[in-house]
Swiss-Prot record:
One of its GO terms (biological process) is UTP biosynthetic process. Its EC number is 2.7.4.6. It comes from Desulforudis audaxviator (strain MP104C). It catalyses: a 2'-deoxyribonucleoside 5'-diphosphate + ATP = a 2'-deoxyribonucleoside 5'-triphosphate + ADP; a ribonucleoside 5'-diphosphate + ATP = a ribonucleoside 5'-triphosphate + ADP. One of its GO terms (cellular component) is cytoplasm. It comes from the Bacteria. Keywords: ATP-binding, Cytoplasm, Kinase, Magnesium, Metal-binding, Nucleotide metabolism, Nucleotide-binding, Phosphoprotein, Transferase. The active site is at H115 (pros-phosphohistidine intermediate). This is Nucleoside diphosphate kinase. Major role in the synthesis of nucleoside triphosphates other than ATP. The ATP gamma phosphate is transferred to the NDP beta phosphate via a ping-pong mechanism, using a phosphorylated active-site intermediate. ATP binds at K9, F57, R85, T91, R102, N112. Belongs to the NDK family.
Length: 150
């Protein structure tokens, strides 16, 4: 089964949207296999956003993501990376489709509620940054046969 990393950013936590974000993904059928609330330090933020180092917005991005707690999670399911990206909506909330997380709750590109891995490789890297091996929980849900054909 595929896995992806999702993070409700400080604006989403402060606005009380963590439960709403999790609910949307669970109702879609994805399984939550790891979840933690944490305050990211500068070192972790810089490693997480390494691909943006040297860009004009890098320092502000790091400052923002370390400004308050985040909810980090790992979701599991078929085609979870691409489906989660679709459910989140465009990075710029003004361009996000209505009904997506960012289209419904996003305010500004710098305050867009949620982050999700953009590829399986990114998901593996980000999961490794935020979670130790023993923190991902393996379990069978009673409803899985109603979600997935075997």
């Amino acid at each position: 089964m595929d896995r992806t990393f999702v993070m409700v950013k400080p604006d989403g936590v402060q606005r009380g949207l963590v439960g709403e974000v999790i609910t949307r993904f669970e109702r879609r059928g994805f399984k939550l296999v790891a979840l933690k609330l944490l305050w990211i330090d500068r070192g972790l933020a810089e490693r997480h956003y390494e691909e943006h180092r040297g860009k004009p917005f890098f320092d502000e991005l790091v400052r923002y993501i370390t400004s308050g707690p985040v909810a980090a999670m790992v979701l599991e399911g078929r085609e979870v990376v691409t489906t989660v990206r679709e459910m989140m909506g465009a990075t710029q909330p003004a361009k996000a489709l209505p009904g997506t997380i960012r289209g419904t709750y996003g305010i500004d590109v710098g305050r867009n509620i949620v982050h999700g891995s953009d590829s399986a490789a990114s998901a593996a890297r980000e999961i490794g940054l935020f979670f130790a091996d023993g923190e991902l929980i393996e379990y069978e849900r009673a409803l899985d046969p109603w979600i997935y054909e075997r």
